[in-house]
């Protein structure tokens, strides 16, 4: 039987105390940290981008599960990979060629 993975979202964090909240979920036993990236186009909300992911990577000791809820995710995969994403997920309806995007993600050494 496979292990259940706990990946709490940072959207419920206090962004004024983001590092503290990240440490709280890590200390509580979270396996991954889920980061929802929203662009205001693919979904109506806007959240965080590459600089915040890079900052989170500096203070987090667990893998970053970056969820791209954006249009044209292929344009941003390299930047999020370089910012420290360990896992990148995207919405199949946001791309024309799902396998090409998976291959692109993996080409940066990131899980898809």
Protein language model regions, located:
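Conserved N-terminal beta1-alpha1 strand-loop-helix module at the mouth
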Residues: 1-89, 93-100, 104-110
């Amino acid at each position: 039987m496979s292990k259940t993975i706990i990946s709490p979202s940072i959207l419920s964090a206090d962004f004024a105390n983001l590092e503290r909240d990240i440490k709280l979920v890590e200390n509580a036993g979270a396996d991954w940290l889920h980061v929802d990236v929203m662009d205001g186009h693919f979904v109506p909300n806007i959240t965080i981008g590459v600089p915040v992911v890079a900052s989170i990577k500096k203070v987090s000791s667990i893998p970053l599960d970056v969820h791209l809820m954006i249009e044209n995710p292929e344009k941003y995969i390299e930047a999020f990979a370089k910012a420290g994403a360990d896992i990148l997920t995207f919405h199949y309806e946001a791309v024309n060629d799902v396998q090409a995007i998976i291959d692109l993600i993996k080409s940066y050494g990131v899980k898809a």
